[in-house]
């Protein structure tokens, strides 16, 4: 796994680990109350280790209990079968998120790696809380809050996840000669490992051709854990996972486990209002990594608006950090192309608007570059926008436009017949087949 590659977004605020709070009926008290899956030592000190401060026992603004409609959406996401597509001749795996969590957690326990709790993170969590946010969701981010003390634990996590994939191969597949390296090449979209003084986490992303990757994130500690308030939500899954295992009856509005949502931005209701009203807000913007600029422009394109006029300062911070993290023009191109590929699946018509929004923000708020470096990046964004237009065969806001140029006078000479027209891909289909004096420049 690449050291320090990629960025995994959650919040700098202390992550609470509230206990599982069952409803009445079969789940009241007894062996399940405050059970093995919730609670414990998790949280504190800006990392995932240490003593837990339970925000939900002494109610604070960080947590909120999901209502029945939200519980139903969460159940639908965890119960949905997601295809993990294999490269080459490898068969497609059919994964249920709740099942892969169960298998991975059990195998890690067998290897003596403790998982304090499991959470749904990112845009999927935001979708559960508010379906009409305009964000949608692609990747399914599942966080395993785990003890990763050294290199051995990181390697064990990797081996366990790859080994678990064998369980999901279709019947009849000979598993004996399939190695972990083979599984990695066949089914893993990317692997990331970060291990330094402030951050200890790893990511294994399982491939889906429609962009709906299943991302398994194993986090011991993380310095900066969110970018904006609208993506700061986490939903604690342990009570629902326990319900799946122990209840013989289906969930109903009057019989379902209590599920806790949390905003690691700080104030849950404030963050939820931002989500419902499409407002962009954050804390400590100087700590947002380089990818925050791309996320910010994505929010703008989706109709979100800044919470205050101080957004110009925020834009300058994000532009500066982007050029710190991606200083080389080649790195910038790879990052932008990757972002377009991963975040606009099925939304190709928005790519041009996104790139023009990014161009405007970079042009207006970049203060940390020499003039030629700034122009170089702006030219890169423009080039990508032109490529998008060529792929879509459209020019925005202009209908039925053809550009012409006038050839040299001797072309009109009846004896001249040696003119060569370069064969290029036109932006617009041209109906005329021959030209007497004027030639299309496309």
From Swiss-Prot:
Keywords from the UniProt entry: Cytoplasm, Disease variant, Nucleotidyltransferase, Osteogenesis imperfecta, Repeat, Transferase
Alphabetical list of InterPro entries matching this protein: TET5
- Result, substituting residue 139 to N: Does not elongate poly(A) tail
Q: Name one GO cellular component term.
A: cytoplasm
- Catalysed reaction, written as an equation: RNA(n) + ATP = RNA(n)-3'-adenine ribonucleotide + diphosphate
Which superkingdom? Eukaryota
GO function terms (MF aspect)? poly(A) RNA polymerase activity; RNA binding
List, in alphabetical order, the GO biological process terms annotated in this UniProt record.
mRNA stabilization; positive regulation of bone mineralization; positive regulation of osteoblast differentiation; regulation of ossification; response to bacterium
**Can you say where in the cell this protein is located?**
Cytoplasm
- One Pfam entry for this protein is NTP_transf_7
Q: Where are the sequence repeats?
A: 24-28, 29-33, 34-38, 39-43
Q: What tissue specificity does the UniProt entry give?
A: Widely expressed, with preferential expression observed in the retina compared to other ocular tissues. Also expressed in osteoblasts.
User: Which EC numbers does the record give?
Assistant: 2.7.7.19
Family from the record: Belongs to the TENT family.
Illness? Osteogenesis imperfecta 18: An autosomal recessive form of osteogenesis imperfecta, a disorder of bone formation characterized by low bone mass, bone fragility and susceptibility to fractures after minimal trauma. Disease severity ranges from very mild forms without fractures to intrauterine fractures and perinatal lethality. Extraskeletal manifestations, which affect a variable number of patients, are dentinogenesis imperfecta, hearing loss, and blue sclerae.
This protein is called what?
Terminal nucleotidyltransferase 5A
State the organism of origin: Homo sapiens (Human)
Provide the organism lineage as a comma list.
Eukaryota, Metazoa, Chordata, Craniata, Vertebrata
